[in-house]
Every structure is written in C-alpha cells, then in structure tokens.
Design a protein with these regions (language model features):
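N-terminal signal peptide
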Residues: 9-20, 275-279
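Short, aromatic/His-centered strand-loop micro-motif at the edge of beta-sheets
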Residues: 118-139
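Aromatic sugar-binding interfaces of carbohydrate-active proteins
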Residues: 152-210, 214-218, 222-225, 230-232, ...
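Localized edge beta-strand/strand-to-loop motifs within extracellular or lumenal beta-rich domains
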Residues: 136-152, 156
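Cleavable C-terminal sorting propeptides in eukaryotic secreted/cell-surface proteins
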Residues: 255-279
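Secretory/extracellular carbohydrate-interaction modules
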Residues: 47-111
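Extracellular glycan-recognition surfaces and repeat-rich motifs
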Residues: 24-43, 96, 100
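Extracellular/lumenal carbohydrate-interaction signature centered on repeated Trp-anchored short motifs
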Residues: 59-67, 130-137, 170-171
Length: 279
C-alpha cells in the first residue's frame, strides 16, 4: 500500500511538470547551452554569438502543451546569423520563428515554419515575410498561439500565418519546450555567404517574455496567408511596438537558472514505477 501511495505521488508530481506555467519576465529562464554567452544587462536578457565562443540557447519555463507564448526581442544582424524563437518536442515536432539574414532581403525577412516528427519539409511548410524596418534595429513582439486546432504566428499582435489541424496531416501536437537560440547557419543558400566576424559580437536581445496557458480551442478558419512572401509595413512601425523597452527597469537581476530543464513525464518513467511496486 505504501509503495502504491508513493507511486501515485511520484506520478502526479512528474505529470504536473508537463503543465504550462503562466510567466511574465525572466525568472523562468534556463540556459540550455553556453552559459557565459547569456547575460542580463541593463534590464535586457542578451544572448551572444562570437567566433571564439559560438552561439547560445535558452529554455523558458517548463514544457508546454497549448498556450500563447510571446517574446519581445531584437534579432541579430549579419549574414549567416540566425535568431530563432521556437517550440521543440523530443520527437522532432517543431514550430518556429526564424530571422534569416540571407532570405530575400537581408535583415528584414521573417520565416515561419513547422515540422512534424522531424521531417524536413522546409519549402513546403515555410512562409516568408518582409518588414519595412531592419529586424536588428527595433524590438518586436513575436507570438506563437497554440491550440488543439491551430497554430498562429503573430508579429506585434498582427496575424502573419495560421496553420489548422484540418489543413494538414502533419500537425505538430506534442508537448514542447520553449526555446530561443542564436547560431551560425554556415555558408549556403539558406544562411548566406558566410559570417563577417569583423561585425561581432552578434546579439539577440530580449526585452520581455509572457506566457499564457491553455487558451480555449475554437474551430479553425482557412489559412489567411496565400503567398510565400508578404510585405509588412504598418505593423513594424515603432509606434505600434508597445513592448519595445520595459519602462520599469531596475538594477535587480532576475533568477536565471543554469541547469538543464526537467524532461516531461514519459512512459519509461511509468514502467520503472510499476516495476518498483510489483517486484
């Protein structure tokens, strides 16, 4: 009986680690790799990339399964330098924003994309959007809305793209970690001709983070974006960026963790618990 009680308590605790947590600010940030390159400076969370130290990556909060995730940041400049904000599951499901410096118009191209089980359908599931201001000049609010029925990608609260579960048989729907990374894509058609290291350091600068959990599911409407490339003008204007810089900056630094995130509950854990009970 005691073993069963312990099992149920452990099961409940492990399962609760999967639940999305409402977050505002930087206190739930976990450095995924390259700790020295992630720094809290003047009220901003800055992620660095240099030739000697490489890029950096963070995870925000616990894993999520449906919610609205907003990160306000200024992307880095530079050929081959990719600033990315995305949801990533262990089975390869992925939903992302990527600021690609070599696509169409350098420093003004946003890519939205999704991948199912790691299948690399890059040109099928990707959409590109051109802004009228360089992405490295201003802080923009990037939002991913995830419901059981659809994903939405938003820029400064304006809808860029929507993918419905009913429009594809490769809809990513696995509990995922929330990540931001800055990295060198290496020379090539997607990333660019190569990094000009005379421009370093390259910085992805974050001014705000907000996570809202479990929005009500609604019936999806058809995709509003019908072309591969769309030009954005008014939505990128500084006057519409309400979260450009926090107005209540203080010298107190948030608690940023430098540990690996706890993995979601999986069936191997359940099997080990059952083995413990009955053996």
């Amino acid at each position: 009986m005691i073993k069963i009680i312990l099992f149920l308590l452990s099961f409940t605790q492990s399962f609760s680690q999967q639940v999305c947590k409402p977050i505002t600010g930087f206190n739930e940030v976990i450095v995924q790799y390259n700790q020295p390159n992630v720094r809290f400076e003047n009220g901003l969370l800055n992620m660095y990339l240099t030739q000697d130290t490489g890029g950096s990556g963070i995870i925000i909060g616990p894993p999520i399964h449906y919610g609205e995730i907003s990160v306000t940041f200024k992307a880095s400049y530079g050929n081959n330098i990719v600033s990315a904000f995305y949801l990533k599951a262990e089975n390869g499901d992925e939903v992302d924003f990527e600021m690609v410096m070599n696509k169409t118009i350098p420093n003004r191209t946003i890519q939205t994309a999704f991948y199912y089980r790691g299948i690399p359908l890059y040109e099928v599931n990707a959409r590109y959007f051109i802004t009228d201001r360089p992405l490295s000049d201003v802080y923009n609010k990037y939002t991913i809305v995830w419901t059981p029925d659809y994903y939405e990608w938003r820029l400064n609260d304006a809808l860029l793209n929507r993918v419905s579960r009913f429009d594809t048989n490769t809809f990513p729907d696995t509990i995922s970690s929330i990540k931001l990374t800055i990295w060198d894509a290496k020379p090539g058609r997607w990333g660019g001709p190569g990094v000009d290291w005379n421009q370093q350091p390259f910085i992805l600068s974050i001014s705000a983070i907000e996570i809202k959990c479990n929005p009500t599911s609604v019936t999806s409407s058809p995709l509003p974006v019908t072309t591969q490339t769309q030009t954005l003008k008014s939505s990128i204007s500084p006057s519409t960026i309400t979260h450009q810089i926090p107005t209540n900056l203080t010298s107190k630094e948030p608690m940023i963790s430098f540990v690996n995130i706890v993995k979601p509950f999986d069936y191997l854990t359940l099997i080990s618990y059952l083995f413990y009970i009955f053996i």
